[in-house]
Amino acid sequence: MASDSLLLTTTEDFQDQNDVTVGTIKCTAPIPFGGEEQWLYLPSTKKFDLSRGSQQKMILDCDVDDRHTGFMVDPGTSVLIVVDMQNYFVNPIYRHHAAGIAAVQPTLQVIERSRKEGIQIAWLNWGITEHDIKTMAPAIQRGFSKGLGWHVGLGAQLPGDQGRCLFKRTWNADLYDPFKAVALPGDLFFDKTRMSGLWSTKEPLHEYLRASGKQTLLFAGVNTDQCVFGTVSDAYSYGWDCILLKDCTGTMTGRGAQELTEYQVSTNMGFVTTSRAFCHAHISEPFEGY
C-alpha cells in the first residue's frame, strides 16, 4: 500500500563563488520510491525501508559506496530462495565447486536466522521430466551438452543410482546433504526448467509469490551469474524486492562474474549484503525511530 504523500523538508546552504552557484540541499523527510508499493529512503539514517508500513522491521546494516547504510524488511512478507544447492551442482563427486562449497555454511546460518524470524524458506531446483526434454528450447539443451564445459547432457543417465541428469526425484537433483539435513516440512520446494525460476507467470514459484503476497526475496545458491542472477533479474522485472546474499552464492565462472553480478544487483536491481549482516540484523519495535 502506498504511503501518504510526503512533503520534503529541506535546508539550503548556497554561496556564490566567482559567479558559480554551489551549495547543498539536505532532505530531512522520508523520500518515496515507486508507485503503490513504495520504498522509503530515510535520510536521517541513510537506510531504505522496504517494509511498507509493517510494525516489525528487520534492519540490516551495510555500506555500499556511501550511497546508503542498509535497509529494512518485513520478515512476514520475505522469502529466502535457495537456488540449485543440489548434488549435481555442489557435491564433490561431480566437480570441484570451491565457491559453492564456501557458500554452504553462511547459507545454513542464514536459514537458521530466517526460521527464527519467520521468514519462509523456499528451495528452487532444477527438476525436469521427459516432457520437458521433448519441448525444451535448443539453447537450453546446448548449455548442458556433453563436451561443452563440465555438462553431461540434461536427462543423461548418470552412474549407479544417481538417476538421469537433473530429473525430478533423482539423487543427483536432490539437495546437497548439508541442506537436506536442515530442510523442514514447512519449507517450500519449487522445480524449474530454465536458469530462471520466474521466467513465466505460470512457474510454480511465480504463482506462489503472487498468491501469498510476498514482496521481498533474499537469494542464495549457485551459480551466481547463471541461475541465481537469472531468477533475480526476472524477480526485479516483475516487481519484487531483490536482495543478494553475496557470501551465500558462488560460481565456477570466476571471480569477475561474481563481482559483475553483485554490481548489477546493487546498482540496478536491489541490494547486496552478507550473511553476517543478515544474522546480526536488529528487529525493531514499533516505537523505534527508523
Model-derived segments and spans:
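A short alpha/beta connector and helix-capping loop motif
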Residues: G76, I93-W126
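Asp-based phosphoryl-transfer active-site loop
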Residues: V79-Q86
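A basic- and aromatic-enriched beta-loop-alpha substructure that forms the phosphate/nucleotide-
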Residues: W126-H151
